Amino acid sequence: MGSSEAETPAKANKASAPQEQQPPATSSIATPTVYPDWTSFQGYPPIPPHGFFPSPVVSNPQGHPYMWGPQPMMPPYGTPPYVIYPPGGIYAHPSMRPGAHPFAPYTMTSPNGNPDAAGTTTTAATAGGETNGKSSEGKEKSPIKRSKGSLGSLNMITGKNCVEHGKTSGASVNGTISQSGESGSESSSEGSEANSQNDSQHKESGQEQDGDVRSSQNGVSPSPSQAQLKQTLAIMQMPSSGPVPGPTTNLNIGMDYWANTASSSPALHGKVTPTAIPGAVAPTEPWMQDERELKRQKRKQSNRDSARRSRLRKQAECEELAQRAEVLKQENASLKDEVSRIRKEYDELLSKNSSLKDNVGDKQHKTDEAGLDNKLQHSGDDSQKDTN
């Protein structure tokens, strides 16, 4: 025991010796002043700053409160940070995930997976709990629970237990019951009991009930106008065999249609059921046929008008060409007459020229003969004188 007690003071002295040597080393490094409330500020805007080039001279570790510290050439670990964030050397960033701040440029995510930029997120579990709490009185709960953000349970997809889901989906957060949920659930339940082959109707009703559940979970109850618009509009089925009765059509159907007033317009053959909404108009088959016939007649009339215009244009061009041909024929005839007259004059001039040439040649020949005779006489007289 005595040896162990003697060894412990020696170890304590050895351990205290390095601790006494460390303070001079740490005291030589100046520690920067850090304000405790800097982590709660979003001090950097989302605009990316200009490029930063590190200087070769080591800067002061006590950085300016509005400037970044020296950026290292090599990142200390992992990938380098984004440009919009300063390097984490001197200033510490607030430990907040992107989108958690209400005024951040990122959308805030809600627990059910739907982004909400306004910052108001509703939990699907709480809304679903309220609706289930209000609608579970006197009703059995579904064996399969609905998960958060899911599109629907297995019963809705397969088309079973549509009555319970329709009634539960009809109850919204405000306690109002939408008419579409009840009507869809009743029609789907009756169809499943009457005939097991109407799977498509069950799927459609399940989709409508799923949409109502999602709207009630988001805290939006359908308004009376929306409930009225969701009601099914019944249209009278027309007989498929034989031609569909419609108003008689003629060539002036367009003029009659536009000229008649509202009071004199013929009544439609289609019938609207008493359950139809006054604001919604169900187009019947005769009305559609009348519109198609009217469009066809208008198209035919426009084609006839364009053909008539083109025919008149061609006729006018032909008449103009015929008139020009007549004028050119008359000019050609006059030119031919003038050419024939000029040719006659030319022939007359040629005959006169030939006659003049003949006269001139005869006169010259006579003068030449007379000159030769005179020369011969003079030469005979000279020879007689020489002989004498």
Curated annotation (Swiss-Prot):
Name the record gives this protein: bZIP transcription factor 1-A
Biased composition (Polar residues): 16-31, 169-179, 214-231
Gene (UniProt): BZIP1-A
Region Disordered: start-end pairs: 1-41, 103-316, 348-388
Keyword presence, Transcription regulation: yes
Keyword Transcription: yes
Superkingdom of the source species: Eukaryota
Species name: Triticum aestivum (Wheat)
Compositionally biased spans, kind Basic and acidic residues: 302-316, 359-369, 375-388
Basic motif: annotated segments: 295-314
